[in-house]
């Protein structure tokens, strides 16, 4: 347990940030799951729309440091490849 005043403050800040990050991570996963669901359904139009909505969210979370920028790029690339395969 935190003993000093500054340690208590850091513990409170850490918990607040943990909850905020958990909320953002959940939102990110929800957007990606919508894209995957549309791909699995075989609906190219819905998958494209869901991807267009998810793309800025993924980028924003990478900018905020929630996920690594390479992970964001990899996620977007793999989803886009699957969407293009639907059109073919």
Swiss-Prot record:
Keyword line: Ribonucleoprotein, Ribosomal protein, RNA-binding, rRNA-binding
GO molecular function term, any single one: small ribosomal subunit rRNA binding
Chain positions covered by the region annotation Disordered: 1-27
Recorded GO CC terms: cytosol; small ribosomal subunit
SUPFAM superfamilies, alphabetized: Ribosomal protein S20 (SSF46992)
Example GO BP: translation
Classification via NCBIfam families: S20
Function noted in UniProt: Binds directly to 16S ribosomal RNA.
Family: Belongs to the bacterial ribosomal protein bS20 family.
Descriptive protein name: Small ribosomal subunit protein bS20
Biological source species: Shewanella sediminis (strain HAW-EB3)
Taxonomic placement: Bacteria, Pseudomonadati, Pseudomonadota, Gammaproteobacteria, Alteromonadales
């Amino acid at each position: 347990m935190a003993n000093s005043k500054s340690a208590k403050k850091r513990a409170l800040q850490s918990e607040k940030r943990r909850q905020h990050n958990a909320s953002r991570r959940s939102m990110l996963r929800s957007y990606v799951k919508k894209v995957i669901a549309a791909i699995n359904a075989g609906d190219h139009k819905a998958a494209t729309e869901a991807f267009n909505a998810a793309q800025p969210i993924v980028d924003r979370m990478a900018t905020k440091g929630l996920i690594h920028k390479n992970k964001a790029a990899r996620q977007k690339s793999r989803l886009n490849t699957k969407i293009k395969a639907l059109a073919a």
